[in-house]
Design a protein with these regions (language model features):
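Hydrophobic, small-residue-rich alpha-helical packing segments that form membrane-like cores
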Residues: 161-169, 174-211, 215-222, 230, ...
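M16 family metallopeptidases and their MPP-like homologs
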Residues: 49, 54-71, 77-79, 96-145, ...
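Bacterial Sec-dependent N-terminal signal peptides
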Residues: 1-25
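Metal-associated gating/positioning segment near the N- to mid-region
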Residues: 85-93
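Active-site His/Glu-centered metal-binding helix of metallohydrolases
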Residues: 78-86, 313, 582
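Peptidyl-prolyl cis-trans isomerase
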Residues: 101, 149-152, 156-157, 445-456, ...
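Proteolytic maturation boundary segments
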Residues: 19-48, 234-308, 313-318, 322, ...
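Internal metal/ion-chelating core segments
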Residues: 206-242, 698-731, 735-736
Length: 949
């Protein structure tokens, strides 16, 4: 209730009339009138909304207010197990029927149909469903069966045990193990201490089917469920269907009482320090626990104001911590704050400070970050800091508001899911925007915005005794000292007693470009492909643009040029390191005369960004903006060419950050595997080496910046592409000022082959690594040279999808060898035209050879018999659905014009005919006449040094 009282104080401060303001603050906020919401007699809640984007598609969710915290001791892991079983047989869809039914209308398992289980909730989704009457009926029946009609057959349960075990294995990371090992300390006296959703493998491997059924029938019931349907639908008809299909479901007799499980307050601080051999770097968290806003007040102005002030406060404080991290003598590479759930529980929140120390400076880093928190608490965040964070929040709201009539369905779905689970508001975009704008303006006029943010910071961080937790996750490596609990406690005491001075907010009050360049001009205008127009500028640059109304708040910009690393002069390892990393590092170094910190402050409240890259055979820019910030987009683009970052402090900090991230990387098996994959594929070419911590000693600011400038020295070498909602006259004006004005070399570089060659023949790289949790991992790459065409691209893509369907059945469902397995086929063009089939299979170590056999068998079966009509029809439906959706996506058209103008590849015209024309023989012939004719198969297998779990 403290947070409610605080919110009421803020409202009174802003609106003066205390009685009226306080009363209004706790009244329910208006519900979005566009959503049809109701509750059936059996208690099931429904949310239905018509929304036309994506066109002719609908989204179906069923939300359960139950998770692992509802399990008893003999059921640990069964909430998550039950989630899996929803895809393994229901009354109306036995066996694999749920997935098969969805895939028939182009909905892909894992991508469009999925689920998740947490401690407090379980949510199932079927996305991007073509909204025909038949498909809608099917999806509602699936939701019905998930709610009440699972078969839970013993043989299906038995097969799924192994899949769950492999998911546990795959997700067993260093941080996960540390958390698991210390939950009892972090949650004293709480049920959450023994309710991690993955559960205990001893229970997963041995529970009886009746135990699972008991959990299902006890907790999966209408009064704890909600059905959410959003899409291009008739909402009234959907509501009627929901009533028809779900009303007959009854709650169990003598139903179990549903309750939230509290996290008890702790009167003394909790310090936990643990280490793991695979923990890459130290991470220290200080958590100030606090009660969440009571559910009955979450749909109120009091809740929204509290959340808004918290967001502004954390944003401002994070900007300050980031600025501190740029100092060369700062002992941490990064620190930030957040307010959210306390670890895995929703019934306790926490304001959390997270610190990533530089190697060997764990305690000092924690103390310095904690001091900065105390500085903000003692002296307050400044009005200018708060204003920047507030302006940034307003600009984000404006972006959503301006595109309110073209929001895609997932935006609304998340609102309704959280409303059901957490009681949070579901106002219309208009009401939300007007409310936040009105409250913000009133708070600013009353002088209460800064005071409110600082008051909430003080409230959250009031005690380092009661409800205070410090958790340190550290590497377990010889030579790396791990801080003790007492050392961290002493660091907190030192920070609390430190004599601090107020923070000074240094702001560079000048424009990004102090003197506008002499503008150039457009010398030629011509029509291009796909509705684009092309301007040729006086300096030789080309600008392609297309106005769209797909997203009222979006302008996309790309710039592309041939060149890249293929034009670099490399005579040493250091040369190679610096040219490979040039764009990444220089991107951290500010822009123009602005340091990295100054640039962040200057751009606060502006929705515009531009990033540069240098690839193997090209370089370019990628940017986006809202229409009102189009000039800023051009200013940033101009500076990327004429005056890239020169902030050496930021450069050095980034070097230290990378060295810290990679300090213990050799102990992380996944990193060794990544390195082996790239080395095997490219014949151990040093140009694909994954760098380690010591390699960053080669980082040279001057060399990187010089290579960056050389790659971006001449706009005549570039094509610029603009797609979205902009005024053409403004675009023309800005193109002449900021692009045509850049001095040019007057010539275009041509494509040059970088000379990076994949290994040929049959290559098998198998190795072992010491692991804390034994894991197997397989990557197989099959590739070859092959002329590119839309037909070949569609064929190899379909081949990957067919193989995925078969591997899921043979390796996951029938073999229980893996949790995640799949194949991806793609055809590429550039300096080389190739196809590639990429198979990924994290696997049970003892089953690695069996999985490899089945991977090989899948390809041989296609070579012998092709694929079934059903397999191919699923793929066609999925691709055609995505193609239709892409017609109103800016990035799709931007990619088409780039492919056409740079490579003369038309990836659009005739696509539907190509997909519809795909046949089993196409796949069969491709495998026999292309893949097997000259087989290049590269297999990388990593296994544990010991199989002991």
């Amino acid at each position: 209730m403290r947070h409610l009282k605080f919110a009421l104080w803020v409202i009174v401060a802003a609106f003066a009339s205390s009685w009226q303001a306080s009363a209004q603050a706790t009244q329910p906020l208006p519900k979005d009138a566009a959503v049809k919401m109701g509750t059936l007699p059996n208690g099931l809640t429904y949310y239905v909304r018509k929304n036309s984007l994506p066109e002719k598609q609908a989204f179906f969710y069923i939300v359960q207010k139950v998770g692992s915290v509802q399990e008893n001791e003999s059921q640990r892991g069964l909430a998550h197990f039950l989630e899996h079983m929803c895809f393994n047989g229901t009354t109306n869809f036995p066996g694999n029927g749920v997935i098969e039914a969805c895939e028939r209308f182009g909905v892909k398992f894992g991508e469009n149909i999925n689920a998740y289980t947490s401690t407090d909730e379980t949510v199932y989704n079927i996305d991007n469903v073509p909204a025909t009457a038949e498909n809608i009926e099917t999806c509602l029946k699936i939701l019905h069966d998930w709610s009440n009609s699972l078969l839970l057959e013993p043989d299906e349960i038995q097969k799924e045990r192994g899949v769950i075990h492999e998911e546990w294995r795959m997700r067993s990371s260093a941080q996960q193990r540390i958390l698991n090992n210390n939950l009892e300390k972090l949650y004293p006296g709480s049920r959450y201490a023994r309710r991690m959703p993955i559960g205990l493998m001893s229970i997963v491997d041995n529970f009886t089917p009746d135990t699972l059924r008991a959990y299902y029938h006890k907790w999966y019931r209408p009064d704890l469920q909600a059905v959410v349907v959003v899409g291009d639908i008739d909402a009234d008809q959907i509501v009627a269907k929901i009533k028809e299909i779900f009303s007959p479901i009854q709650n169990p007799k003598n139903e179990a009482k549903y309750e939230d499980y509290p996290v008890p307050s702790t009167m003394k601080p909790i310090y936990v320090v643990d280490k793991d051999k695979e923990q890459g770097q130290a991470v220290i968290q200080a958590m100030f626990k606090h009660d969440p806003m009571p559910k009955e007040y979450r749909n109120t102005a009091a809740y929204l104001i509290t959340e808004g002030l918290t967001d502004i406060m954390t944003s401002a404080l994070n900007a300050r911590l980031n600025e501190l991290s740029q100092n060369p003598d700062c002992p941490f590479v990064g620190a930030y704050v957040d307010d959210g759930n306390y670890l895995i529980s929703k019934t306790m929140k926490a304001f959390t400070l997270i610190v990533v120390p530089k190697p060997g400076k764990d305690t000092e880093a924690f103390r310095v970050a904690f001091e900065e928190l105390q500085r903000a608490r003692q002296f307050g965040l400044t009005a200018t800091e708060i204003d920047r964070a507030y302006n940034e929040m307003v600009s984000q709201f404006e972006r959503i508001y301006n595109n309110r009539d073209k929001q895609r369905s997932p935006y609304f779905i998340q609102q309704y899911v959280h409303n059901f689970l957490d009681g949070t508001p579901m106002m219309s975009i208009e009401d939300s925007y007007n409310f936040m704008k009105m409250v913000g303006q009133q708070l600013k006029q009353a002088g209460a915005l800064t005071e409110g943010c600082n008051s909430i910071l003080k409230e959250y961080t009031a005690s380092t005794d009661s409800n205070f937790v410090v958790l340190a996750m550290c590497p377990d490596k010889a030579g790396i000292a791990v801080p003790t609990e007492s050392q961290l406690a002493d660091a907190v005491k030192a920070a609390l007693s430190a004599k601090l001075t107020a923070y000074v907010d240094n702001v560079k009050n000048e424009p990004l470009i102090t003197k506008l360049p002499k503008k150039g001009k457009i010398v030629k205008t011509e029509k291009s492909d796909f509705g684009y127009t092309c301007w040729t500028l006086s300096n030789g640059a080309k600008v392609y643009y297309r106005q769209t109304d797909f997203n009222e708040s979006q302008v996309l910009m790309q710039a592309r040029s041939f060149g890249g690393l293929s034009y670099a002069k490399v005579n040493s390892k250091a040369d190679l390191f610096n040219v490979r990393n040039a764009s990444t590092f220089i991107e951290q170094c500010g822009l123009g005369s602005f340091s990295a910190t100054e640039l962040d402050k200057a751009l606060a409240g502006k929705q515009a960004s531009v990033s540069a890259y240098i690839d193997r055979e090209s370089e370019g820019l990628d940017g986006n903006a809202t229409p009102k910030d189009l000039r800023t987009l051009f200013e940033l683009t101009y500076l990327k060419f004429t005056n890239p970052g020169s902030d050496r402090k930021a450069f050095n900090n980034y070097v230290e950050s990378m060295k810290t991230q990679l300090a213990n990387v050799e102990a992380v098996p996944e990193m060794a595997f990544r390195d082996s994959v790239s080395s095997t594929i490219y014949n151990h070419d040093p140009r694909v080496k994954i760098y380690k911590s010591a390699d960053y000693d080669m980082a040279n600011f001057d060399q990187m910046r010089a290579f960056y400038r050389e790659r971006f020295k001449s706009p005549s070498d570039f094509n610029f592409y603009f797609t979205g909602n902009f005024n053409v006259d403004s675009l023309k004006q800005f193109a002449e000022i900021y692009l045509a004005s850049i001095p040019s070399a007057g010539k275009r570089e041509v494509l040059k082959d970088y000379g990076l060659h994949k290994a040929t023949g049959i290559v098998d790289n198998r190795f072992t690594r010491a692991m804390e949790t034994p894991k197997g991992n397989i990557i197989q790459v099959i590739w070859g040279e092959n002329p590119y065409s839309m037909k070949e691209s569609a064929t190899v893509d379909a081949l990957g999808d067919v193989l995925t369907q078969r591997y899921l059945k043979s390796i996951r469902e029938e073999g229980s060898m893996a949790y995640s397995v799949g194949a991806q086929g793609e055809a590429s063009y550039g300096s080389k035209e190739e196809y590639l089939i990429y198979v990924s299979c994290p696997v049970k170590p003892a089953k690695a050879d069996s999985a490899l056999y089945l991977i090989d068998l899948g390809l041989k079966e296609v070579a012998k018999d092709g694929c079934t009509k059903e397999e191919l029809d699923k793929i066609k439906q999925f691709n055609l659905k995505n193609y239709a959706d892409n017609q109103k996506v800016n990035s799709y058209w931007a990619s088409l014009i780039r492919s056409k103008t740079l490579w003369n590849k038309d990836l659009h015209t005739g696509y539907e005919a190509v997909i519809n024309g795909l046949s089993s023989d196409d796949l069969k012939n491709f495998v026999n006449n292309v893949v097997l004719k000259k087989l290049n198969r590269l297999t990388i297998t990593m296994l544990p040094a010991s199989l002991k779990e």
